[in-house]
Structures are given as structure tokens and as C-alpha cells.
Amino acid sequence: RAQALANPVQPVALADHRAKTLDEVIAHRVSELTDYRNAAFAGRYSQMLTRAKEGGLNEAALMALARGYYKLLAVKDEWEVARLYSKPSFREALAQTFDGDLKLTFHVGAWPFGGVDKVTGKPVKGEAGPWMLKAFGLMARFRGLRGTLVDPFRNNAEARLAREVLAEYEADIDFALSHWSADTASTLTELLALPEQIRGYGHVRERHVAQARQRRAELRADPAMSVAAAWNWALSAGRQHRQADARQHDRTSNSGG
């Protein structure tokens, strides 16, 4: 009787199947986000990339954005773990890997199974039997509840941190668009690539987030940013002034002047 301490089925390794062009990367991520949540959620991603393209970011910055934004949107939370366990490929992998009658044991850190070690104060996982597969299947069907008021995981520490980091990154995208120049391109590309440094779960992830936030502050404080912002503002103001003059000229011409 074999016992399998199962781990969630992992997404296809991008190291082996990495899309080469920016458009291919975006298309792949849109497909993944549609499966992760829904088409509207994937649209949020694609619309941001379109905005960044139109904003003048170069290829390297757009690639960093395409990967970084996806990583923060597609957080592997309780709903995603349930979806991965519910995929037919998980059962197929078990059948191909093990012979005989399997006994599955799931180590679950989320409420209501997880807890805190009384000695170390660190999170610990609880065990659940094979009946969890049915629970995962039910969760996968209702993953649209993620982030809503009835999401039982919405206010746990990891979910709150994920929302904070995502909001900060979206602010960084706005920052990059308003401060973009030839002199700031490399710094802003590094800023948009910071999510690649965030890994793990629990206290490990918190440590990586803290390190990324420190680097974020350093990059945003680069003296070249204020120069680029002032220059971009002047260009924008000039365009608006010319457009206003053109509209005034059209009104004058149409009135018979």
C-alpha cells in the first residue's frame, strides 16, 4: 500500500516551454489567467500591457512587466491550489508514478487546518485525508468567490500581503509611465522586474517582500526620476496646449471667421 505525500501539480515549466516573443508571453499569460480566474481577470492584465505599450516602454521593460504583473496576479493561494489538485493531470500523474492502492495525505497550511507552533511561533500545516480531493473540486468550481466578501481566506495574512504588493506594483507601472526616458529606462526596467525576487510562502515570502520593497524605494528615489517627470510633464502640457489651440482654430473657422 503506497502512501503519497502529494504536492500541487505545477504549471508547465517555462524554462522548457518559454515563449520567445513579447506577444507570445502575453498570450500565454492571458490564457493562464483565464484558467486561474476568468476572462475579465485576464483582461485586466492585457489592458495594462496595452497601456504600457502605448506609453512608450521599451521591449525589455514590457517583458519585465508581462512577467512581473502576471506573477502578482496569479498568486498560488488556497483557491489556486484547489484548482491544480482538481485537474485530471494530477490523478493521471499519480497513476503513472505509483502502483497499487494509494493513500493520499495532504499537508494543508490554510484555515481551518493550519496553526502556529507554540514553541517557534511559526505557521505549521495540518494533515487531511483523501476526502480533500472532493473539497478541492468544490473549491475549484467556486473560485470566482476569490477576493469577495464571502471568501473565507480573504483576510488571512498572505491574502492581505498579496493585495498590498499588487497595489504597489500597479503604482509602479504608473510611475514608470510618467518617468520614462532614455536615462531612466534601465532603472525602471529593474523596478518592473522586482516581482521575480518574491518567492515562497509565509515568513519566507514576507522576507522577500521586505527586500523587494527596500530596493523599490531605492529605484524610485533615483535623481534621474525627477528630471524625467518634469520633462514628460512639459511635453504633455505642450501637447495639450497645441490641441486646445487647434480646437479653438476649428471653432473659429466653423463660425465663419
What are these regions (language model features)?
Residues 1-246, 254-257:
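Active-site loops and adjacent core secondary-structure elements that bind or stabilize anionic groups
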